[in-house]
A protein has these predicted regions:
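N-terminal pre-domain/capping segments
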Residues: 1-83, 265-278
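Hydrophobic faces of well-ordered beta-strands that scaffold small-molecule active sites
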Residues: 3-15, 40-42, 59-65, 88-90, ...
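Active-site-proximal loop/turn and secondary-structure-junction residues that shape catalytic pockets
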Residues: 13-15, 44-46, 67, 92-96, ...
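Charged helix-capping and loop-helix junction motifs
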Residues: 23, 78, 101-108, 133-134, ...
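Active-site acidic/histidine proton-transfer and metal-coordination neighborhood
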Residues: 60-148, 157
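Acidic/histidine-rich catalytic cores of soluble enzymes
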Residues: 115-201
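A short, acidic, amphipathic alpha-helical segment used as a generic capping/interface helix at domain edges
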Residues: 168-171, 207-228
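Aromatic-rich peripheral "rim/lid" segments of glycoside hydrolase catalytic domains that contact
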Residues: 239-278
Length: 278
């Protein structure tokens, strides 16, 4: 990722948040930059022309991928490095692996990241090796070098974290929070993984405050580490075709572009709070 002598927050737009006809157009990069984003995240590996078009506007670029076997970590890391990406967020495994298989995957991710000099952030995503908070905590204890992408809605909604005390569960996952170097931003409630949060006011949406608590802790942990790169906060509000955005009477619940800007506002507030606590 981009070298820096100071800690900083960089807000990236995940291109999967935009309609297909929009995010395949280089014109979208201008709108993204004008909205205040400093980079973009590609879902699939684009052509080099696309990468260069973003970079020509001063936008950072990162990518994503999936690793199903140890060898896949090295192939993906090399492809990401060759594409000029700053980092990759990765889905690893399917969540059905035993501990020995999980350990082999984790070791390969770490080795591939070091070999190709590109951060590989393992996502806290359903249907992956980090789908469960207990296993995630145990894994980072065994592999403290593992870097993690905080895709918190998968845990918050998928594991119904409010049931049994969300504060206790946030405390429990602290060892994972300390390893998080990337955030995929969407906010869910206990029943739906992606919901309209209005202007971000938590007075009537207490789940917003829960996400902000986690994000602030993630930023605090980042600020305690050596300043080697900026922190990537990637807005990732996905469409109804994959059952993320909700629809009512054939219309999406909210404007995902506008909601992404609310998430950016919350991220900056959380980062400032973390800086004040440092």
């Amino acid at each position: 990722m981009t070298n820096s002598v100071t800690h900083s927050l960089g807000c990236y737009m995940n291109l999967g948040s935009l309609e297909a006809s929009v995010h395949t157009s280089d014109a979208s990069f201008h709108a993204i930059r004008e909205a205040g984003y400093v980079g973009v995240q590609f879902g699939d590996f684009p052509t080099q022309d696309r990468v260069q078009a973003a970079q020509a506007l001063g936008l950072g670029v990162c990518g994503s991928g999936r690793i199903n076997a140890p060898a896949g970590a090295f192939a993906l890391a090399q492809k990401g490095a060759d594409s000029g990406f700053e980092c990759l967020t990765v889905h690893v495994g399917w969540g059905m692996e035993d501990d020995a298989e999980v350990d082999r995957l984790a070791a390969a991710v770490i080795e591939a990241s070091q070999k190709h000099r590109i951060p590989l952030y393992v996502e806290t995503h359903r249907a992956t090796i980090l789908q469960d908070i207990w296993r995630a905590v145990q894994l980072v204890k065994r592999f403290p070098e593992l870097e993690v992408n905080c895709d918190f809605s998968h845990w918050y909604t998928g594991l119904e974290m409010v049931y049994g005390g969300v504060e206790k569960k946030i405390e429990f996952i602290h060892p994972v929070i300390e390893r998080m170097g990337f955030i995929h931003a969407r906010i869910g409630n206990p029943g739906c993984i992606q919901v309209d949060i209005g202007d971000g006011d938590s007075a009537t949406r207490p789940y917003v405050a829960h996400f902000c608590t986690v994000w602030t802790q993630v930023f605090s942990a980042y600020l305690k580490r050596p300043a080697t790169h900026r922190f990537c906060f990637g807005t990732e509000l996905l469409g109804p075709e994959i059952y993320y955005a909700r629809t009512f009477n054939g219309k999406e619940e909210s404007d995902r572009w506008e909601q992404a800007l609310v998430l950016v506002k919350l991220a900056n507030e959380c980062f400032s709070k973390a800086q004040g606590q440092a």
